[in-house]
Amino acid sequence: YKDYVPSHYELGFQLVSYADRRYDEYIGASITRYTSDYPILIFTTQLALNKYYGTSTRQLFRETFSSLNELWDSLPDTGNSPRVVSPPVKIYTTYSHPLYVNDSTLLVLKEDYDRASRFVEIDLHSGQERTVCYTGPVSTRPVFRNGTVVWTEYRQSTVWEQKVDSRLCVMQYGDDRYRQEASFGDGVLYPVLTDDGDLAFVRYHYDGHYSVELHSRERGTLRTHFDESVSLHGLAWDDLTQCFYYIALSDDGMSIGGVDFSGLKGRRFPVTSPAYVTVNNLSAGDGMLYFNSIYSGKDEAHTIDLSTGRQYRISESRYGSFAPSPSPGGEFVALTTYERDGYKTALQEVEYWEEVEWTPVPRNVVNAPLKPWDVPVVDDVVFTEEELNASMEKHPAERYSKAGHLFNLHSWAPLYYSPDRLMENSTLDAQFGATLISQNLLGTTEASLGYGYTLDGHSTVRGRFAYYGWAPKIEVTALWSDHPHQTINTASSPFYTSYYKGNSFDLSVRAYLPLLLSSGYRIRSLVPTLQFNLDNTEIITPEGQSNRASLVLASVQYNEYVRKARLDLQPRWGYTLRASTVSNPFSKLFATAWSVYGRVYTPGLFLHHGLTLAAAYQRTTDVFPMINVIDFQPRGYDQIATTSYFAASADYLFPVAYPDWGVSGVFFLKRISLDLSFQYARYLEPEYFIDLTGTAGNGLQKRGVPRHIYTFGGAVSLDIAPFRMPAE
C-alpha cells in the first residue's frame, strides 16, 4: 500500500527472460511440468527451482534485478523535457489524458491510493487543483470540444456480472455532473466530437469486428466496417483536414489510418505503414496527429504532420511520456510523464527532437537482449486447407457437455475452512482437517468439500455446490457433525425442556437474482432471495409428535454506495436496505416473522476511517416465537427467541499500520486495521421457554419480559497476501 506494485506479468517477464539467458532454457516449462506431476505439493515453484536449477525465487529475483540495474546504470540520463505542472503528491498518483480547456486550464483524469477516479482541473497560472466530478471505471480516454467532454466507461450487464460493455458518457463542462448515454448502445469506444457537434466513435461488435460510426445531425449515421483481423485502438478528429484518424492493429502490426466521411460511404486511407511498434492515445488538431510511441525504446510523445506525412518525436523523458494533447494554439502539448511516485501532468513545448523513420520493430533500450528461440516465426507458419481438413477429421467438433464438466478439482488445502466465506467476507474459520476445491472451466460452478476436527473431539463434514450459469444463482450447502443435535420438548408444559442427542446436520438451499444497476461512480444492486433451511433440531409437539426445524426465508435487498479507493476499508458513503420474512410452513410451532434492516456508511474523522450505523426491527405475526433473529444479533448471541426485537450498532473502522512485511513465500502483511464496535438489542423474552443462550440462572423466562443487551469491543483485521499470490 505504500508504493506502486507492478503487475505479476511485468515482473514475471523480467524474471523469466533473465532465467532464459542464465540457464539457457525456458524455466516455465519445467515449473509447469513439476506442478502438474506433483499437485499435492504446495510450494511447487520453489521446489522446482531448487530441483532443476539450484536456485530459489528470492535468489532469482536478486540476480535478475542486479543484471537489470547494471544495464540501466549504463544508459545515459536523458532527464525530462516535459515540465510538470500538477501539484506535488504524497502518495502514488496517476494522472492521465490531460485536455486543454483553454490556454490556462487543463482537465485531467486523476486516481490515487486515497481517492477513486475523478476529473480535476489544473490552473496553469496558480498550480491549484480542483475536483470536478468522480467517474466510474473509464474504458477509453476523454475528449473535449466546444464545452463538451465525452468518454466511455465500463458497465456491467444488469443480469450477467461477467458481461461488461463500454458506454458513452457526456458532460457539459461547468456542470460538474455527467450522464451515460444508453441511446447509442453498448460497445462504444474512443468517442470524438466535430466542430459541428456531430459525434463519432469506434464500435466493437459482438461478432468480433470493429467499425467507425459518424452520427451526423444532418446526414444520419454513416459507418465503415473493418475486417475481423483488424482491431481499433484510437480515434481522433482533425479540424483542418475534416477527417477522422484511427489506430489499427492487424497481423502486420500497428498503423495509423484515416476515414473521410465527406461521401456517402467512409473512404479509408493509410497514414503510416504497419509495424510492430506500439502506438497509443491518438489526438489531432490543425493538421497534426499526436500520440505516444515506443519507437525510441521508451514511450515518448510523437507527432505527424499530415501535410507532409513526416513523423517526429517531440519529448525526451527519463521513464516515458504519454497521451499528448495539443494546446489551442498548437505551441504546447499537455501529456503525462512517469516518475517514481506516479504519472504527473506536464507540458511539452512542440519541438522536433528526432525525425522518425519507419522501422519494423522498436529499439530495445531498457530490456536486456532476448536469446533467440529455436522456434519458427508464427507468421512464417503456413496451415493449408488440406491440413485443416485433416485436423478436423482427426479431431471432430463435439458439442460441449455442460453437465459433464460441472466439476474440476483444482486445489486442496491442508486445513478445514469455507472457501465461499473467505471470498465473500474474508472470514477464515479454519480447523484441523482438509478441504478440496473445484471450479469448472466456464466458471459457472463452484464446489468444495471439507473435513474438520475440533479440539473438543468432534468431526465436521461440509459440502457446498453453487451454480451461476443461470440468471438466478443457486447455492446448496450441507453440513454434518457428530456433535449432538438439540431436542426441545414442548410437551413438558408448563416448562419446556431441552437436551442433546445423536448427530446433527444442516441443509441450506439458496436462490437469488442479483440485478446490477451500477452507473458511474455509484454502485447499485437489487437482490431478491429465496432460501430454505433444514436441520435436525428436534421439536416435540404438545401431542408428542417429533418435528424437524425448517425455515423458508424470502428477502429483497437494495444497495447503493460509492466506489472505494485502494486504501479505503469501506465505502465512504452508502446504504443498504433489506426487508425479510421467514416462516416454517411445515410446523405450527413456529410463527411467521418479518424484519426490516438498514445500514449506512459515512466517513470517519480522518482519511480512510469509516463509521457504519445499522439498525433492525423484527416482529412475529402471532404468539409463537422464532428460534433465531433474522438480521444481525449482538456479538456473543446466536439464538434469541422472541416476538419483538430491535437492534442497533455503530462500528468505527480505521487502519492501524501498514507493515509491508512478511515471510518470503509464506505471507505478506500489507495492513492492520481495527474495528471498534458497540451493539444494542432489546427483545421480549417468551414465557416458559428455555433460554438457549444459557445466560439465565434457571434457564426459564416469562413471555413479554423485556431484555436489553449491550456489547462493545474491537476486532483486529490483517490484510494478508498468502503464498506469493498477486496483490491484485
Where does each model-flagged region fall?
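A flexible loop/linker signature enriched in serine peptidases of the S9 family
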Residues: 92, 110-119, 134-139, 152-168, ...
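C-terminal outer-membrane beta-barrel translocator/porin domains of Gram-negative envelope proteins
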Residues: 478, 491, 545-678, 682-702
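Transmembrane beta-strand segments that form the barrel wall of outer-membrane beta-barrel proteins
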Residues: 185, 317, 404-455, 476-482, ...
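A short beta-strand motif characteristic of beta-propeller blades
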Residues: 82-90, 128-133, 177-182, 220-226, ...
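Feature captures outer-membrane beta-barrel proteins of Gram-negative bacteria and organelles
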Residues: 303, 433-440, 459-479, 500-517, ...
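Outer-membrane beta-barrel initiation region
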Residues: 91, 293, 354-471, 475, ...
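Beta/coil-rich, acidic/histidine-enriched accessory regions frequently appended to metallopeptidases
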Residues: 29-147
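Outer-membrane beta-barrel translocator/channel fold
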Residues: 158-159, 299, 318-322, 340-343, ...
